[in-house]
A protein has these predicted regions:
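Intrinsically disordered, low-complexity, charged terminal extensions of DNA damage-control enzymes
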Residues: 1-21, 26, 191-349
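Catalytic cores of DNA base-excision repair glycosylases
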Residues: 3, 8-202, 206-215, 219, ...
């Protein structure tokens, strides 16, 4: 049996019988496909299912997204993480409107010119929205290919990755009409059956042709990437309220943690925290240290110490915004800050 030729046939048949068919972005609309693909980068489907409909309701077309203020986009994105995706999403929408007349291009190379769209994302848009014979190669797909074809190599080696691209391209079905089912099948198989741990080999349509299974190498393929060391980063928050109880927020720099979101004044050293407070007329003795909280990012553990104060600085002492508690949800806040401010606050008076 020709494993390569039977791979696509098996996958398409399996997807149509057992794959996921109720995802809201499974429509021939390149805007919806693109939006979902960006959201799904490093984010679980279950999480995206919560954000996607709200985002689409607010921005039903690429034109409405392009015309929106970036702060509005970031506000809706808050909690999804990897905020550069939201900034790139906004820029890409403006590119589609400005450079392509508001119509998504159907060629992969053109799609790759959009901010935040790489080869695999562009291929997914081509396959789902335009039935183009373009292959995706995300983490789930790499795992499927490495196991079915017993491909062993350093996942961080560019030559090995290129060999997987070549393999993936050779497996594409011959009929353009099969591309949506084939592409969704790759995603579904990797996400629900050929899982990283505890794969469900008895449910896999490739079980009898899987080389890793024959060689008893399922657990070792694909090789694991060398995980970077998780670094602990201390942060200090200043929770400052004015006479009306509004909270001081500042916009974070575009680059770095929570880039572009609104946050309370946030610092990496205690000294910076004290210096900033003094500029607002708040002496360090009037800062009340609260119990620290932690928040895990991909390769960082944030150790956050909030400081509250009973002092009420003058509003003209800061370039930030004073936002009443009932309007905090209108701003894109980092999730740990949003969670913290929704807790019962200490009585300092």
């Amino acid at each position: 049996m020709n494993t390569s030729s039977s791979f696509a046939e098996r996958l398409i048949r399996w997807q149509r019988q057992h794959g996921r068919h109720d995802l809201p972005w499974q429509i021939k609309n390149p805007y919806c496909v693109w939006l979902s693909e960006i959201m799904l980068q490093q984010t679980q489907v279950a999480t995206v299912l919560d954000y996607y409909p709200r985002f689409l309701e607010k921005f039903p077309t690429v034109q409405t997204l392009a015309a929106a203020p970036q702060d509005e986009v970031l506000s809706l994105w808050a909690g999804l993480g990897y905020y550069s995706r939201a900034r790139n999403l906004h820029k890409a929408a403006q590119q589609v409107v400005g450079q392509f007349g508001g119509t998504f291009p159907s060629e992969r190379k053109d799609l790759e010119t959009l901010c935040g769209v790489g080869r695999s994302t562009a291929a997914a848009i081509c396959a789902f929205a335009f039935n183009r014979r373009e292959t995706i190669l995300d983490g789930n797909v790499k795992r499927v290919l490495c196991r079915v074809f017993a491909r062993d190599g350093n996942p961080q080696d560019k030559k090995f990755e290129n060999s997987l691209w070549t393999l993936a391209e050779s497996l594409l079905p011959s009929e353009n009409a099969d591309m949506p089912a084939y592409t969704q099948g790759l995603m579904d198989l990797g996400a629900t059956v050929c899982k990283r741990t505890k794969p469900l080999c008895h449910q896999c349509p490739m079980a009898d042709i899987c080389e890793a299974k024959k060689q008893n190498r399922i657990a070792e393929l694909p090789r694991k990437k060398t995980a970077p060391e998780v670094q602990t980063l201390p942060l200090y928050w200043l929770i400052i309220r004015n006479q009306d109880g509004a909270i001081l927020l500042e916009k974070r720099p575009a680059k770095g943690i929570w880039g572009g979101l609104y946050c309370v004044p946030c610092f990496e050293t205690l000294n910076e925290t004290y210096v900033y407070a003094e500029k607002l007329g708040i002496v360090s003795d009037d800062l009340s240290e609260q119990p620290a909280l932690t928040h895990r990012l991909t390769h960082r553990l944030l150790l956050i110490t909030p400081f509250q104060t009973p002092q009420r600085p003058s509003e003209n002492l800061s370039d930030g915004l004073w936002v009443s508690p009932e309007h905090l949800a209108d701003y894109g806040l980092p999730k740990p800050l949003s969670d913290y401010l929704n807790r019962p606050q200490p009585d300092l008076f």
